[in-house]
Amino acid sequence: ASGSAALQRLAEAKGAVELLLADCYVRRDQVALIAFRDERAELLLPPTRSLVRAKKMLAALPGGGATPMAEALDLTRDMAERAGKQGTTMQYVILTDGAANVARDGTRSREAGTADALAAARMLAMSPSSGLVIDTAQRPQPRARELADTLRGTYLALPRADAQTLNRAIRAATP
């Protein structure tokens, strides 16, 4: 039951992000997608205005597995710095339960993964960006809130709600 509940929560979070993508399309914003699971983080979709490509990549995004959070935050910082050089401030949304358990060197360790993730979060917080951490855990987790606080971002526990309700919460939390 917990596995199917987690998949349902991920589906609702993806639905909310899809609604957010539609808003970005209307404003002609660029969007990018970074997946972080198992051994590494990967830029699946470089910054683009293509809503169709973004939706396809989001739909195919799997959940579960190990979490190389630091590497994902490093990629996010790199994109934020590039955006800053172009005179823009990047906004990002992170869907996570906050359980960083892969260190930068690839070691599977919750302690090292968390330490590396928080160090990467401190660096990202200094970039021209603003962020939102959506806690996808069944129950709100202190580690996801700590990540949001370190990022100087907004924390939002995934409510038991549909994508529309979550999208309204995201809109309220992001500029």
Predicted regions and their residues:
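Helical mechanochemical/support elements of P-loop NTPase systems and associated helical scaffolds
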Residues: 6-9, 13-16, 50, 54, ...
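Von Willebrand factor
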Residues: 1-47, 71-75, 88-95, 131-140
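Short beta-strand-loop
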Residues: 6, 29-60, 80-83, 106-108, ...
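C-terminal helix of von Willebrand factor
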Residues: 147-175
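N-terminal-biased segments
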Residues: 72-80, 92-107, 111
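N-linked glycosylation sequons
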Residues: 66, 71-78, 85-86, 122-125, ...
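VWA/integrin I-like adhesion module and closely mimicked acidic/polar interface patches used
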Residues: 99-150, 156
